[in-house]
Amino acid sequence: MGSKIPLPQYETKGSAGLDLRACLDSNLSLQAGTSQLIPIGFAMYLEDPGLAAMVIPRSGLGSKHGIVLGNLVGLIDSDYQGELMVPAWNRSDTDFEINPGDRIAQMIIVPVIQADFEIVDEFNETQRGEKGFGSSGIN
């Protein structure tokens, strides 16, 4: 792993996401309406339970070509130690070609807070209360 395709990197100084590249031996045609696991050529282990990695779509592939992740967002826990794969989903009506080395997703490293829960009889009152979807308005 990691010898054919460069390791993930930030494309610009302001990039939040590391680009993940398709580690393929040849071009792959992702048929319209289908998904396929794409190897990205490396394994990782974060180790620190205060961190996790999230794999998310690249905005241009999603908005211009309909290529997103089959699981929408991938969460990589700090104790995972295996090879990473990207579940690419072609939600368009046109086949899409993925070439070896193409940037197909991005990964961000995020802090994690593991919450402790407790049972309570009632909550402190707030202005919003139980008002749900759309209750805070749009303007």
Curated annotation (Swiss-Prot):
GO terms for molecular function: dUTP diphosphatase activity; magnesium ion binding. Its cofactor is Mg(2+). Substrate binds at residues 58-60, 71, 75-77, 85. It comes from the Bacteria. GO terms for biological process: dUMP biosynthetic process; dUTP catabolic process. SUPFAM superfamilies: dUTPase-like. It holds the Pfam family dUTPase. InterPro entries: dUTPase, dUTPase-like, dUTPase-like_sf, dUTPase_trimeric. Transmembrane segments: none annotated. Its EC number is 3.6.1.23. It is an enzyme of class 3 (hydrolase). Keywords: Hydrolase, Magnesium, Metal-binding, Nucleotide metabolism. It catalyses: dUTP + H2O = dUMP + diphosphate + H(+). Pathway: Pyrimidine metabolism; dUMP biosynthesis; dUMP from dCTP (dUTP route): step 2/2. CDD domains: trimeric_dUTPase. This enzyme is involved in nucleotide metabolism: it produces dUMP, the immediate precursor of thymidine nucleotides and it decreases the intracellular concentration of dUTP so that uracil cannot be incorporated into DNA. Belongs to the dUTPase family. This is Deoxyuridine 5'-triphosphate nucleotidohydrolase. It comes from Gamma-proteobacterium EBAC31A08.
